[in-house]
């Protein structure tokens, strides 16, 4: 959530910066609500002052034995008006809050201005795409003989679900273990196991609600007035970031660095017809997430560090990739600045997103009321960052495509062999005649 004081001081400036993000701020509606709020607050303060004055007058009159009934009646009338004003003020504050909850974060000044992914800016590349001396297959054709089973996944749960079997399932697990081990043993993160189902207020904290309810899978139990609504997490960023919700941490405890391997559940409501083949876009997929909670003056150094941590995974796996700075129109709702990592997929002859690392500054912290005690001992909002380290399914896709062999086998990257019992390659199971 944005700082409402920023809007009160520079409404037109905020509106312009939000327009760069593709969001049209209803300046007239905000101004009207603010004017009404100020008028009610001013009137309430006047009534409070008048009531205080009359209360003193009543005390003095009683001391003199004078009749106070008329003054008491006026005090009663003031009380009734104040109750009505408080109710109206509460209504206005709710409307302001609803308006604020729908506003995306303001982009950092270094973010390129643009409308969509076509305006993103490539920062750097690593690795050289492999040259194949045979016809390259995509991960579906490579993986299906090795244990990638889309047919059974669809039979069990519908489109965009996958079953993994045998060595492919083991490779998928090895990738997640390798990522977690790298982040905990080399990058200083604390491994965390989180709930996969969370309460609605948790999603308000990280910005998925109210705007993106259609992208979430909802879980309901009970019935009627006793219905309890919860949601499956779309990323463990949700659970990890909210660990500091409604708390004040000591400055000496920062940075807090957490990582988790979890399934993620997304309805992909706005993705109809996109990436329908294979594992690129699934309703259920695994991801290793990184989250950092830091002091404001350290957040952009932390963003660069986090990007480096995601890059390290790709480098250790020997997968070519590029780093892209997202433009204002392509960033996520809560982000102030985002870098995407895109891995090379030879069958598509292009780079595809495999990680997104974002600094949300105080946007999520303000929604969660997550603070730290600064050097002066005063509570101050933290900055929160999140990044994929990496999406496990898409990394599996990249390994299958980049490490495929002409005979249909897949070479196991050296970094994963300790997690695969020393296995150097995955061959299709022998066909039983």
UniProtKB/Swiss-Prot annotation:
ATP binds at residues 266-268, 353-356. The keyword Cytoplasm applies. It is found in: Cytoplasm. Pfam families: Seryl_tRNA_N, tRNA-synt_2b. Its EC number is 6.1.1.11. GO terms for molecular function: ATP binding; serine-tRNA ligase activity. L-serine binds at residues 235-237, 289, 388. GO terms for biological process: selenocysteine biosynthetic process; seryl-tRNA aminoacylation. Pathway: Aminoacyl-tRNA biosynthesis; selenocysteinyl-tRNA(Sec) biosynthesis; L-seryl-tRNA(Sec) from L-serine and tRNA(Sec): step 1/1. It catalyses: tRNA(Ser) + L-serine + ATP = L-seryl-tRNA(Ser) + AMP + diphosphate + H(+); tRNA(Sec) + L-serine + ATP = L-seryl-tRNA(Sec) + AMP + diphosphate + H(+). It is an enzyme of class 6 (ligase). GO terms for cellular component: cytoplasm. Keywords: Aminoacyl-tRNA synthetase, ATP-binding, Cytoplasm, Ligase, Nucleotide-binding, Protein biosynthesis. Consists of two distinct domains, a catalytic core and a N-terminal extension that is involved in tRNA binding. Belongs to the class-II aminoacyl-tRNA synthetase family. Type-1 seryl-tRNA synthetase subfamily. PANTHER family: SERINE--TRNA LIGASE, SERYL-TRNA SYNTHETASE. Catalyzes the attachment of serine to tRNA(Ser). Is also able to aminoacylate tRNA(Sec) with serine, to form the misacylated tRNA L-seryl-tRNA(Sec), which will be further converted into selenocysteinyl-tRNA(Sec). Homodimer. The tRNA molecule binds across the dimer. This is Serine--tRNA ligase. It comes from Burkholderia ambifaria (strain ATCC BAA-244 / DSM 16087 / CCUG 44356 / LMG 19182 / AMMD) (Burkholderia cepacia (strain AMMD)). The lineage of its organism: Bacteria, Pseudomonadati, Pseudomonadota, Betaproteobacteria, Burkholderiales.
């Amino acid at each position: 959530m944005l700082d409402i004081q920023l809007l009160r001081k520079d409404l037109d400036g905020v509106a312009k910066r939000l327009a760069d993000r593709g969001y049209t701020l209803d300046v007239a509606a905000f101004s009207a609500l603010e004017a009404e709020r100020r008028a009610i607050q001013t009137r309430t303060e006047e009534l409070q002052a008048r009531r205080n004055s009359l209360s003193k007058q009543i005390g003095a009159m009683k001391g003199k034995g004078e009749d106070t009934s008329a003054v008491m009646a006026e005090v009663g009338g003031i009380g009734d008006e104040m109750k009505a004003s408080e109710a109206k003020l509460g209504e206005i504050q709710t409307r302001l809050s609803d308006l604020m909850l729908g506003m995306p974060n303001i982009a950092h000044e270094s973010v390129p201005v643009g409308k969509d992914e076509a305006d993103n800016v490539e920062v750097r590349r690593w690795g050289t795409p492999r040259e194949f001396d045979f016809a390259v297959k995509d991960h579906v054709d490579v993986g299906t003989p090795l244990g990638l089973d889309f047919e059974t996944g669809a039979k069990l749960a519908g489109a965009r679900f996958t079953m993994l079997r045998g060595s492919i399932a083991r490779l998928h697990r090895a990738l997640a273990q390798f990522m977690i081990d790298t982040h905990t043993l080399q990058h200083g993160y604390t491994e965390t196991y989180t709930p996969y189902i969370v309460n609605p207020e948790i999603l308000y904290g990280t910005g998925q609600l109210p705007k993106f309810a259609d992208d979430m899978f909802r879980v309901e139990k009970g019935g009627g007035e006793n219905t309890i609504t919860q949601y499956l997490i779309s990323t463990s960023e949700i659970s990890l970031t909210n660990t500091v919700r409604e708390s004040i941490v000591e400055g000496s405890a920062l940075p807090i660095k957490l990582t988790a391997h979890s399934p993620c559940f997304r309805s992909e409501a706005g993705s109809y017809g996109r990436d329908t083949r294979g594992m690129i876009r699934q309703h259920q997929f695994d991801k290793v997430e990184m989250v950092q909670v830091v002091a404001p003056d350290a957040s952009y150094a932390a963003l660069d560090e986090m990007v480096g941590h995601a890059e390290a995974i790709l480098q250790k796996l020997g997968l070519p990739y590029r780093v892209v700075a997202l433009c204002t129109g392509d960033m996520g709702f809560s982000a102030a600045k985002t870098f995407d990592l895109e891995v090379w997929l030879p069958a598509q002859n292009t780079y595809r997103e495999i990680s997104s690392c974002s600094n949300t500054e105080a946007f999520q912290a303000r929604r969660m009321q997550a603070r730290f005690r600064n050097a002066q001992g005063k509570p101050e909002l933290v900055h929160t960052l999140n990044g994929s380290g990496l999406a496990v399914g898409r990394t599996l896709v990249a390994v299958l495509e980049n490490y495929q062999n002409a005979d249909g086998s897949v070479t196991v990257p050296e970094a994963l062999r300790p997690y695969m019992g020393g296995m150097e390659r995955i061959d299709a199971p022998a066909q039983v005649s």
